[in-house]
């Protein structure tokens, strides 16, 4: 029976799109889903027209706007809070990142308590843990592995602090006498259809057909398909709705994982770009030189910020992320709430390859005719 009302903040983004689609496909109790975002994309409007069984309500709003948020969460059962600024290139100021990611999260918690929301699932990130600014490796870690999470950059620090705030809110009594159930999910390096990072890499390499990697071949990263991240969110919310404060998820954190291979970041991406005849090359520059360039880029970004937006992909933070092994090996989500990846690695790869081919076809059709 369809009785539940979900709200997904940041629902028009990359991961939000996967969560909305999978909610509609696999959550049999879903009656209504409200997609709360600062913009409403055409794909969502198309989905509203096509979907007759479930009510889809687009809501334009900012998580920093408490009154709009309160209205969007009225009578909601579950909130999946994705909305955040995920910026590693320096496009946004540190103050903006902290304001949206921390104060926005506090507003979401307050609105949940004001409206008597039963379940709040927070989309955190592995960046809340690391890599830290020292570049310390995490090798086959899990949720219980000790790691010195010292952050200097605004994004990972904001996710770390927001995650802490979400977990501390678990069990708080709402205005209507219900205790709020909260958990945090940490996706690893997410890939899949509509991934903005993969699209950026494609567009920057479209003409040259060359991609470059900076890190040693022995530097590995864990990756996870967006559809499986979405599935874990759905299972987590379902378990907390069914079990309330007795759910093992309450006040708990989980890495989002699947069976995707653990490889070098760019070697992994070539599973999708090889089909286009793209070539992956090692940079000839030594690490000390890359660090120098990264710091120069950071300085230029600050100097040029009053007159233009200079956001090179290579900066001290992105260099540390690429050059630091960060791998996770866990089955905590399976043990606690029965999570098994919905999509195999082969299916995940195939879906992503198809989307990349669609990007290629679109780019080719827009080429000026000679």
UniProtKB/Swiss-Prot annotation:
InterPro entries: 3Beta_OHSteriod_DH/Estase, NAD(P)-bd_dom_sf, NAD(P)_dehydrat-like
Annotated signal peptide: none
Alphabetic keyword roster: Isomerase, Multifunctional enzyme, NAD, Oxidoreductase, Steroidogenesis
Catalytic residues in the record: 155
Entry binding sites for NAD(+): 159
GO MF annotation terms: 3-beta-hydroxy-Delta5-steroid dehydrogenase (NAD+) activity; steroid Delta-isomerase activity
UniProt key word Oxidoreductase: yes
Gene3D superfamilies in the record: NAD(P)-binding Rossmann-like Domain
Pathway connected to this protein: Lipid metabolism; steroid biosynthesis
Documented EC number(s): 1.1.1.145, 5.3.3.1
One example of a Gene Ontology biological process annotation: steroid biosynthetic process
Substrates-to-products reaction catalysed: a 3beta-hydroxy-Delta(5)-steroid + NAD(+) = a 3-oxo-Delta(5)-steroid + NADH + H(+); a 3-oxo-Delta(5)-steroid = a 3-oxo-Delta(4)-steroid
Pfam families linked: 3Beta_HSD
Database matches in PANTHER family: 3 BETA-HYDROXYSTEROID DEHYDROGENASE TYPE 7, NAD DEPENDENT EPIMERASE/DEHYDRATASE
Family the entry assigns: Belongs to the 3-beta-HSD family.
Role this protein plays: 3-beta-HSD is a bifunctional enzyme, that catalyzes the oxidative conversion of Delta(5)-ene-3-beta-hydroxy steroid, and the oxidative conversion of ketosteroids. The 3-beta-HSD enzymatic system plays a crucial role in the biosynthesis of all classes of hormonal steroids.
Name the UniProt record assigns to this protein: 3 beta-hydroxysteroid dehydrogenase/Delta 5-->4-isomerase
Originating organism: Fowlpox virus (strain NVSL)
């Amino acid at each position: 029976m369809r009785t539940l009302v979900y709200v997904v903040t940041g629902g028009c983004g990359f991961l939000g799109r996967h969560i909305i689609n999978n909610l509609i496909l696999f959550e049999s109790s879903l009656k209504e889903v409200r997609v709360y975002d600062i913009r409403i994309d055409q794909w969502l409007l198309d989905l509203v027209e096509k979907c007759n069984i479930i009510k889809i309500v687009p809501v334009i709003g900012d998580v920093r706007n408490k009154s709009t948020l309160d209205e969007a969460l009225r009578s909601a059962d579950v909130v999946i809070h994705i909305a955040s600024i995920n910026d590693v290139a320096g496009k946004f100021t540190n103050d903006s990142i902290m304001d949206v990611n921390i104060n926005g999260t506090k507003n979401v918690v307050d609105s949940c308590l004001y409206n008597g929301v039963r379940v709040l699932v927070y989309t955190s990130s592995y960046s809340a843990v690391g890599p830290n600014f020292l570049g310390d490796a995490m090798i086959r870690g899990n949720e219980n592995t000790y790691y010195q999470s010292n952050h200097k950059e605004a994004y990972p620090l904001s996710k770390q602090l927001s995650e802490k705030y979400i977990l501390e809110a678990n069990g708080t009594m709402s205005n209507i006498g219900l205790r709020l159930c909260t958990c945090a999910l940490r996706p690893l390096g997410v890939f899949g259809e509509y991934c903005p990072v993969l699209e950026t890499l494609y567009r920057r390499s479209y003409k040259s057909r060359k991609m470059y990697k900076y890190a040693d071949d022995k530097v590995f990263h864990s990756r996870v398909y967006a559809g499986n991240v979405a599935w874990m969110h759905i299972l987590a919310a379902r378990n907390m709705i069914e079990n309330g404060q007795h759910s093992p998820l309450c006040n708990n954190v989980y890495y989002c994982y699947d069976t995707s291979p653990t490889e070098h970041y760019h070697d992994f991406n070539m599973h999708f770009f090889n089909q286009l005849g793209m070539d992956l090359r090692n940079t000839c520059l030594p690490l000390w030189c890359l660090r120098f360039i990264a710091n120069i880029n950071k300085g230029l970004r600050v100097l040029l910020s009053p007159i233009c937006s200079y956001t090179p992909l290579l900066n001290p933070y992105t260099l540390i992320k690429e050059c630091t092994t960060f791998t996770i090996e866990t089955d905590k989500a399976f043990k606690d709430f029965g999570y098994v990846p919905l999509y195999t690695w082969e299916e995940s790869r195939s879906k992503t390859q198809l989307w990349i081919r669609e990007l290629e076809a679109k780019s080719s059709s827009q080429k000026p005719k000679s």
